[in-house]
Amino acid sequence: MSMEEKQNFQTSLDFNQNIFKPSTREEIVEIVKNCYKKSIPLEISGLQSKNKIGRNFQAEKTLDLSNYKGIIDYKPEELYIKVKAGTPISEIEEALKKNNQQLAFEPNDFGYLFSGESNSGSIGGVVACNFAGSRRFKVGSVRDHLLGFQGVNGKG
């Protein structure tokens, strides 16, 4: 990142807002570090596909990862795909389908229960919750098929 990009980046984050919608890893790191330093509770959110499951979460700020999406690398011959956390499962399945492939696990789609429409969520939410469908006993869970991931903690 150039010096000019760093200056623009630092001034573009308004920490007075309640919902952050970063689109880069650097923005995510900056937001998490800042909230950690100030002891601000932070809810991590994506496509809201699982927000009606479990207890309500009370946080001062929300880190919405729905803008941090996209397929970074896909090698069909290697059965390998690298994506950002906010990438919708539907986008991943669409890319795989073009090569006559599918996910090795079965992501749940709770959208039909809550809104009557499909919403299988983002890959980040699926990995975080480790939800898988009825084929889980035979083919394994989400994390069984995960080769790696990059995370962010309060120190960056």
Predicted regions mapped to residue ranges:
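Glycine-rich N-terminal segment of FAD-binding domains in flavoprotein oxidoreductases
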Residues: 13-110
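FAD-binding subdomain of flavoenzyme oxidoreductases
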Residues: 105-106, 110, 115-156
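Intrinsic disorder at enzyme termini
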Residues: 5-10
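A charged N-terminal "starter" segment
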Residues: 1-2
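Short beta-strands and strand-loop turn motifs
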Residues: 12-13, 130
